[in-house]
């Protein structure tokens, strides 16, 4: 008999097209050992130590330092701490540490915990690649692995209230003429080459706007976006929740769209670790991964949403009002543009359902191809080779099998196939050059 009871296994199963978010937290065997954790940032509940990490499967170490940014998609790392999942899998001393910006996250990953930095992080999916290649580390590579995707969807593109009369949505075309009337119009994102940079560039380019010609980009840390829009530092910005909803709730801007409307179930954040840490501590890496995966399942249960948002709102985590987090976590959208509030669980942030946790290699290949599109990476970049080096979907599969995730919930291929964007453009991971050729606006460098 497996580690699941039969009833638990039935509850754990997801139906492929379910609109409601379901799932169940995994359970251990009988006669468990109980541990209480209290180290690191945040609090933890008592948890039974899983038999999956006993004896020869015990982690090599009991601690790791993991970074996070105050964004709702960091929830799995935080919930794994608060609910004692790290302890459950033999890692009671894990620290989950707030980072001021993605640049800080990068710098601390390069340092590593032995030098006062961190071992892994909640991170923009392209960043482990840019760090591994040395692109954003002054040419000094720091090899990293992606162990899981943390979420899909859940980001927003906002505009200042002075653009509200344009009623801009997925079609950004009306902004071209409006931006032309502004001296040096700026749009903000959170890290060059990161997901938010890619979303806002794609959206504006689809509307006929060219970076460097029709607008320039600036970097603003997520938690500083709302303050910057209040002083009119930019015309538009892209960032993850809860900051889009906070912008609306404070009445300082409105939302044009949520990124699931650009690309349904698009990949977003990753659980990234330094490669040397994983290679030196393979059992501990698996334990961390199992803890994060269980937290993802917990986060996607509808009955846990309010508790999740209450936890995230705490001073030690986000220090943000509960009201700025909860609606978007339930798929409820008020864009602050005068239109009716609507509910859509298909485009909302997901952590586990619809294979949200599995790190498809094809998605990482798109991010690298898009970085080529905008000149962050040379056209000669061997995207497949670097994806095969960084993306450790094999470790995800190993953890999923240990947790007895049903086989039909483990993707049969590391590719999700051809992806279609809101403007009809398609990306075939087997032919990324065809995608680049199809784009009218790009800045490809040799």
UniProtKB/Swiss-Prot annotation:
It holds the Pfam family NMT1_2. It comes from the Bacteria. A lipid is attached at residue 29 (N-palmitoyl cysteine). Keywords: Cell inner membrane, Cell membrane, Ion transport, Lipoprotein, Membrane, Nitrate assimilation, Palmitate, Signal, Transport. GO terms for biological process: cellular response to sulfate starvation; monoatomic ion transport; nitrate assimilation. SUPFAM superfamilies: Chitinase insertion domain, Periplasmic binding protein-like II. It is a lipid-anchor. Residues 1-28 form the signal peptide. It is found in: Cell inner membrane. Nitrate binds at residues 102, 155, 196, 240, 269. A lipid is attached at residue 29 (S-diacylglycerol cysteine). GO terms for cellular component: plasma membrane. Belongs to the CmpA/NrtA family. Composed of two domains (I and II) organized with a C-clamp shape. Part of the ABC transporter complex NrtABCD involved in nitrate uptake. The complex is probably also involved in nitrite transport. NrtA is the substrate-binding protein. Binds nitrate. The complex is composed of two ATP-binding proteins (NrtC and NrtD), two transmembrane proteins (NrtB) and a solute-binding protein (NrtA). This is Nitrate/nitrite binding protein NrtA. It comes from Synechocystis sp. (strain ATCC 27184 / PCC 6803 / Kazusa). The lineage of its organism: Bacteria, Bacillati, Cyanobacteriota, Cyanophyceae, Synechococcales. The gene is nrtA.
